[in-house]
Amino acid sequence: MRVLIALLLLTACGRSITSSERLLMGEVMGASFNANEVRMLEAGFIGMRTRTYPVRPQVTCREKIAPPPSGPTFRTRTAGVVAWQHVLTNPDWTLTNYAAGYPDRINLVAAMYFAHEMTHVWQWQNRAATGYSPFRGLAEHKPGVDPYLFDPNEEINFLEMGASLVEEYICCRTLAPEAARTQRLYDTLAAVMPVQHPTQTPRPVEVLGVHEDADLLGICD
């Protein structure tokens, strides 16, 4: 309990989300998401420990835009933790605006990270339907479990992989709005939130965060 009280005291100093961040999430979650209640706060203790996972198959949009793997495993740190409507960010992942320049410009890495964390906030705000709690969200970070590993060709339960699905949708919607998997992701999200159809969302003129050697052909087919 003392730890939770300390977290709440810390988050009282956090920033609210920007107008462009609100626009980005409004296109995905609409009125089902209350942006006014969200607070972002850098927390030095987030990501202090490293974890090692097997390299993920290069089958998702998220993995295809990243630098190619250099070995059979990779090391990573927790980038953020959500406590109710407060997002505690690893200093290496802290930005003053994760959607700077949006909708004309988007940094996919930043936008996808932000969307992932906002989905956990959304899950809490809609907990009557999702059954979500911050303690359930912490299960993402337990040892030996890669929170981003899923097969995009399998039927996926939103309640189990919701944050990763929204993240993947942002990636596919931006790079391949008319692709088959983009439509499947849209259908999955539309069953639980008022997401805007990918072909109705303006495409940014400038897209950052994509590795220079990434093959975008058929990236979300």
Question: Language model features by range: what are they?
Answer:
Residues T18-T50:
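Post-signal peptide N-terminal segment of mature Sec-exported envelope proteins
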Residues S20, G26, F33, R75, ...:
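Metalloprotease/metallohydrolase-associated module, dominated by Zn2+-dependent proteases
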Residues M118-T119, Q123:
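Short active-site segment of divalent metal-dependent hydrolases/proteases
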Residues R56-A111, W124:
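Active-site scaffold of zinc-dependent metalloenzymes
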